[in-house]
């Protein structure tokens, strides 16, 4: 594989390459594993997992994606700038106070996770004399956000007199551990709770839930990490997904060291033989974790080589002997 061209003279020593064709392949692969009528949604939190929400959302829209999920209101507003209006944008972290008018103005879908949010959203809809869309998040075991079962039992249809409940969702806590009994427990509770809203779409599966099989897919699967192609490698699952993200760093210096020489802070790496050490212009400030010191690996000319010594803020060293 040819190295990517760096600007000349180079303005930075790290380049992140996003393969949009691989992204599209992954989306099509996931969608092909769903039954007819089930939507493959895309989770584009945190700037689309760092890939760039503009380019990623536009390509996924071209591939047919119409259900998009983000974490925060600001992300939803930004996303809306890049794709046509015939989409659904869900804001997973819920409706904060005094945000109602903004959601209404941009026609965004808050994922309501407690009784106060439900009351405020319906009251706002009444004042606007409109019926705004919303999703409901039921907590079936993740215990972070969402309505606990005791609060779901309190819900009445009158609570939604001016609200269109588009989707009922929950989130699997152990989807990345396929045999875990909690997956089935959460699914059973989700089935029980959503019976009160038979007219709404249902969404339970995240990327991990997709690989649990059709019983977890329902109407919308929320694909996030799987879109990047890294899911299969991280969790050792056989899936025809392609890596989307590749990071390239420049070599700033090559050093010939002798047996017994130390490398980097705290001399945590001692060369056991005559070695060739390359210094890269990337470090933990760029997101390469300090915890990978003396543990991580990178590719050098197509070969995996070990990190040698501490990862520092903007430099790291690798053994290319």
Protein language model regions, located:
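A charged N-terminal "starter" segment
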Residues: 1-109, 164
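Active-site loop/helix belt of alpha/beta enzymes
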Residues: 11-12, 46-51, 58-63, 104-106, ...
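Conserved beta-strand positions in the central sheet of alpha/beta enzyme cores
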Residues: 69, 90, 111-112, 169, ...
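Short acidic/glycine-rich loop or secondary-structure boundary segments that cap or lie
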Residues: 211-214, 229-232, 259-262, 287-291, ...
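Hydrophobic structural segments
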Residues: 217-218, 309, 320
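Functionally critical, mid-to-C-terminal surface segments that flank or help form catalytic/ligand
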Residues: 247-294
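A generic structural motif
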Residues: 277-281, 312-321
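A C-terminal functional module that forms or caps the active site or interfaces directly
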Residues: 299-317
């Amino acid at each position: 594989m040819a190295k990517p061209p760096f600007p000349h003279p180079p303005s930075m020593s790290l380049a992140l390459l996003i393969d949009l064709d691989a992204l599209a392949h992954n989306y099509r692969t996931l969608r092909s594993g769903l039954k007819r009528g089930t939507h493959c949604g895309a989770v584009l939190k945190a700037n689309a997992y760092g890939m760039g929400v503009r380019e990623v959302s536009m390509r996924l829209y071209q591939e047919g994606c119409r259900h998009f999920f983000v974490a925060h209101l600001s992300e939803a507003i930004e996303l809306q700038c890049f794709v046509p209006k015939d989409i659904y944008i869900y804001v997973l972290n819920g409706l904060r106070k005094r945000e109602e008018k903004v959601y209404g103005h941009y026609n965004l879908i808050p994922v309501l996770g407690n009784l106060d949010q439900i009351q405020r959203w319906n009251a706002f809809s009444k004042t606007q004399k409109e019926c705004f869309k919303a999703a409901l998040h039921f907590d079936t075991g993740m215990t972070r956000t969402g309505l606990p079962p005791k609060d779901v039992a309190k819900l009445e249809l009158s609570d939604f007199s001016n609200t269109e409940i588009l989707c009922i969702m929950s989130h699997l806590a152990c989807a990345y551990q396929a045999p875990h009994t909690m997956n089935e427990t959460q699914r059973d509770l989700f089935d029980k709770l959503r019976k009160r809203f038979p007219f709404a779409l249902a969404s339970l599966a995240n990327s991990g839930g997709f690989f649990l099989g059709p019983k977890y897919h329902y109407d919308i699967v929320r694909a996030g990490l799987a879109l990047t192609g890294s899911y299969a490698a991280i969790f050792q699952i056989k899936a025809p997904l392609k890596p989307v993200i590749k990071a390239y760093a420049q070599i700033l210096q090559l050093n010939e060291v002798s047996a017994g020489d130390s490398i980097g802070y705290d001399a945590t790496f001692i060369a056991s033989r005559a070695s060739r050490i390359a210094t890269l212009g990337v470090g933990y400030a760029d997101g390469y974790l300090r915890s990978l010191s003396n543990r991580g690996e990178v590719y050098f000319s197509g070969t995996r080589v070990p990190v040698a010594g501490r990862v520092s803020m903007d430099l790291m060293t690798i053994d290319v002997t």
